[in-house]
Amino acid sequence: MITLKELKKNPYLIEFIEQAGERLRLLQYTDHGLDHVDLVSARARNIAREIGLSKDKQEMCAIAAFCHDFGNFLSRTYHNYMGAVIFQQLFQKDFTPSELAQLMQAIVNHDKYEMEFTDPVSAVTILADKSDVRRERVTVKDKKVIEEDIHNRVNFATKYSKLGVDKKKKNITLVLKIDTSFVPVIEYFEIFTDRMTYCRKAAKRLGYKFNLVINNFKLL
């Protein structure tokens, strides 16, 4: 198995990620480029380490999280499936069949809320990705344009975002601080209810409980 550091040397992968980010930026989506996947990858590695997964599993979680969104360079629709297939074409020789299958499953599962997670790599990837809510993800600069889109509004209003793991209490907690002068907290739930369901299911697969704290109030 190659490492994330080695995988990042593939020029096709990096180009696809950069084009995915640029394509969605032009469509006024939140960031899905290198900044997003670098953060999600680091978060996935940390979750995997904190819950006690093996070194190899930690590496796989970091890799799946880094690669989960690059299919967007082709299309937003079915980007998870396209990303998984292209990943297989790029890296088939670098992983065992079992490793490759788990990585492809994680890339596909990150965007299918009805899927059941059969391995920890998919579950960790979901938690790392769906918890990435923060002001820095807003690519639009015009505040009037930001105010017109609920996803941009909620991300822009999120001044602080941290995902923590308490191994002793078996809790995985997302802590957010939202500027309620810009958006009411209810708008967060209007767009992220499905994501929180993802996170709860993923945490349960790992033997943990998912908690959500917004502005010092525990909501889940």
What are these regions (language model features)?
Residues 29-32, 116, 187:
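Non-transmembrane, amphipathic alpha-helical segments
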